[in-house]
Amino acid sequence: MKELIEAGKITHWGISEADEDTLRRAHAVCPVTAVQNRYSMMYRDYEKLFPVLEELNIGFVAFSPLANGLLSAKYNKNSKFDAQTDYRSAMPQFTARAFDKNEKLIRYLEEMADNKNATPAQISLAWMLAKKPWIVPIPGTRKYDRLIENGRSADVELTEEEVKEIDRMLDRPANVRGIRRVKSRVRYRN
């Protein structure tokens, strides 16, 4: 990457799924512009990287910020996903048992969304945007109306206290259930 930058072929570069050690080693060779990792209310493990990102002035691109759609509150324990075509069929947060555990979080998002004239997805994204100015969520969508809805999350304002309140709720293990990846996909990660 350093050679490509020096040759003028690229101006910035980033890495995905990086932990602190990988990030520091890469940055020592060629300054990293951004790191892309999974991050959402359901998966906050990479928050431990935030001090390093601030120290090194690296942006954070958050993929799956809506936890594969769970935080949109559009699904429930009766939702079915085709095992042949929809990877959510194998994701633990979409089991009936997980929905029972996550119901409190979903209700909380719906209530806050009603109070803010927003959607649960917008609250989830606004929470992320309020965390740090260098976080850029990249929610995936196939539908135009979801694209517009997600974009409008930038207009939803959460106070510092509201963000802390959400964090306190998320810190209680009883309120969040689901894991990062299904076992069949873990083997592809080093």
Question: What do these predicted regions represent?
Answer:
Residues 15-16, 64, 118, 137-140:
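Active-site-adjacent beta-strand anchor residues
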Residues 9-12, 110-126:
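Acyl activation and transfer enzymes in specialized metabolism, enriched
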Residues 19, 39-45, 64-71, 127, ...:
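Glycine-rich beta-alpha junction loops
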Residues 55-56, 83-111, 115, 130, ...:
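Terminal-tail/helix-coil boundary detector
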Residues 1, 30-33, 51-54, 77-82, ...:
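Short, hinge-like loop/turn segments at secondary-structure boundaries
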Residues 13, 35, 53, 60-63, ...:
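Conserved, mostly hydrophobic/aromatic
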Residues 1-41, 48, 58-59:
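Glycine/proline-rich, positively charged
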Residues 45-84, 119:
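Aromatic-lined glycan-binding groove of carbohydrate-active enzymes
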